[in-house]
Structure formats: C-alpha cells, structure tokens
Amino acid sequence: MINNITVSGNVTRDVEKRGTVDKPYITFGLAVTEYKGNGEKSPMFYSCIMFGKRAASVADYIQKGTKICVSGQLASDNYTDKNGLEHTGFSIKVNDLELMSAKREQESRGW
C-alpha cells in the first residue's frame, strides 16, 4: 500500500530541533488551505516531523510564516485536549521539504 502526501502551506510555529548530533530531527506545524467546490476555503493543520542531517540543515531556514512544500507519509493521531475531549489530528513524517519562500522574503514583499 502506498501512503504518500504532498502539500504546501505556511509553517505555524518555529521549528523545534531535537534528538542528538548523530540522530537529529525537527518538528513544526503546517497550515494548508483546503479549497472547497463552492468557493469556500478552510485550513487543515498538520504536525510534521523530519529526521536526519537534512532536517538539521534546513531547520535554520524555517520559521513561523515560511511557505514550504513537504512530501511524506500521512498518519492520524488521536489525542485528548485540556478539556478532556477526544480529537483526531494528522501528522506527516516528512521525507522531502522544499522552501517556497523565506519569512524575511515574504515580509519584504508585503505578503
């Protein structure tokens, strides 16, 4: 079975660097605008995790507001919020990441 997703959107929080020097990984949030057939749009939110040396090297270029495109494996996550309500969220184990614009570039262009 093939499980692959490719989406582009805006990073919702600054990257968190984790792991060790030998096994680094990063986590970040991604908001993707979903366009519906009737002209409405709504956001989809994903938690993202990326492993390896490439993750460590791109971490310094990604911050809240950066527009990126990611490809990876989609997973659903069940969690309980602070009010005790059950929710299902989605996460992406990122295999490939492309910077579409840096936050500084967006600000200079007035995006």
Each model region followed by its residue ranges:
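Acidic, gly/ser/pro-rich intrinsically disordered tails
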Residues: 1-5, 15-23, 36-41, 56, ...
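OB-fold and OB-like beta-barrel modules that bind single-stranded nucleic acids
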Residues: 5-13, 30, 64-75, 94-97
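Short, acidic/hydrophobic/Gly-rich beta-strand patch recurrent on exposed beta strands
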Residues: 27-32, 47-50, 90-93
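Beta-rich strand-turn-strand
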Residues: 51-87
